[in-house]
Amino acid sequence: MTGNQQMERQHQVAIVGGGPVGLALAVELGQRDIDCVLVERHRAPVRIPKGQNLTGRTLEHFYFWRCVDEIRASRVLPPGYPIGGVTAYGNLMSPYFYWAHTGGRGPRDQDYFFQRNERLPQYATESVLRARLRDLPSVTTHFGWTAERVEQDDDGTRISIVPSDESAFYSWSADAQQVSPQASDARADRRVLRAEFLVGCDGGRSLVRESMGIERSGRDFDQRMVLAVLRSRELHEALKRYPESTTYRVLKPELQGYWQFFGRIDVGEGFFFHAPVPKDTRPDNFDFLGLLHEAAGFAFAAELDHVGFWDLRVMTASRYRQGRVFIAGDACHQHPPYGGFGLNTGLEDAANLGWKLAATIQGWGGQDLLDSYAQERQPIFRETGEVMIAGGIGRDRAFLERYNPEKDGQEFEQAWAEFGRRARSARQAYEPHYEGSPVVAGPPNGVCSIHGEPSLAAQAGHHLAPRLLSNDRNVFQMLGQGFTLLAFGAEEAAVRRIDEAARSLRVPLVVVRDSFDAERAAYAARLVLVRPDQYVVWAGDGAPADPMTLLRTVTGQELRYGAGRGLPNG
């Protein structure tokens, strides 16, 4: 169709934005046979190497999305290459530095997560997810289309889409020293898509969020940042002074707590670089090579492949839902790429919202289940942004104002060692949980928070730790697409009561039986109820006093116990 002709088709879920979060949500829904449509303005993934660090928890999602092997095969770094970072004072040639490993060591990774972490460019992650979508017949994709307008009414949601005009996207040519517009397409065709629900995964400048009148709050640091993509063999060789690392950040007083940092794209010559720059900086009026040399501490030959800019903000949406419309990923939370939280947080949004949308559409999720998405996810990012990111900038700034190696070298060395130790331990204390969720039978006065301690014990509101069964398979290999009841040495009558309650409510439930010994004893409960995103919603040694109320609570059909109120055992 051409001109002003329009085509309407009804879907169950429409997704605006097909970056990694939107793609992941489409996979999550498609695997549950939900009819969804995805609209993405780019025809192909944009080859800018951001969002590279994928945690062990995120790799669990890819396992359940049935493409974890493809993710690992898409890595650019050699298998087993250490995922960790160097922090240096002044520049990368400084004698003052510390190193922090962020992959595959200790209970957080080997014991607490079923998968080890991975590192690859975001465009490679997107390519894997796009390929996975091709195997899911219930998902329709519109790549190269842009959402122009979003509306909702009592009957559903409505999106007007047009072919993308990619002349709005620019590339930086280091040779020509200018920006060049890409080829554009005429907006000759308009279409209208309808859906029961709509999810905006369309980034920090979200059309969906703005159309719904959802405001954001947080902190705007009023700081322009540059993202440069470069190739330099000389830089690679110079960085051999450090243990093998994936990131190299520089702290110094004049940066006021902001970072200059390099990240590896590959092992050999590919890097990206972030740093604060003056507000009026453009690709054609700034010495970017000079900035790279300043951060590195020496001059080196380099080829610039891309230069872009972003504004340093830590922002959270006031709400994640407006009627039938939801937002996820950067559309509801935005922050600088400090700490590797961004993409992982967005993918957790997708996993959380996806099963709840499917449950609601399929009829076994109650009217309150969808509200629990924001009730769980919003406080997690608010604390992440305020404590880990904005708070981290403040802590770095305070340290740099207080200590200086030129004034008191011994005092600085002692403080720097302690500074590094605290930086390493802070991330180890990051354990997002939903103890205060209204759809979790959590402890009295529980709250949803990032502050916790990874534990092998099964705790309501916390991520399930993977354990081996007596047949040498992992518990995670037995988890169902719906709820799963782990019954380890439990009385059969108790198992039967919970199973019968689930059947009567049409809640999909898989029962995994085994003995209560060996690794399974670490759960400290003979009965563990696990929801579709691998979080524990209830644990005990005997059946709850009212299994029907338990199942209604954790599926949003009844909030009798409310947030943070436990269900006693019978």
Where are these regions (language model features)?
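Glycine-rich FAD pyrophosphate-binding loop
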Residues: 30-51
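C-terminal helical "tail/cap" subdomain of flavin- and related membrane-associated enzymes
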Residues: 318, 358-463, 470-479, 483, ...
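Core beta-strand elements of the Rossmann-like FAD/NAD(P) dinucleotide-binding domain
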Residues: 9-11, 186-197
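Conserved FAD-binding catalytic core of PHBH/FMO-like flavoproteins
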Residues: 131, 139, 181, 197-314
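Beta1/beta-strand and adjacent pyrophosphate-binding region of the FAD-binding site
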Residues: 7-21
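Active-site-adjacent segment of FAD-dependent monooxygenases/related oxidoreductases
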Residues: 47-50, 55-132, 254
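A conserved short coil-to-beta-strand element within the FAD-binding core of flavoproteins
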Residues: 143-158, 163-167
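Conserved mid-domain beta->alpha element of the FAD-binding
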Residues: 17-27, 31-33, 62, 129, ...
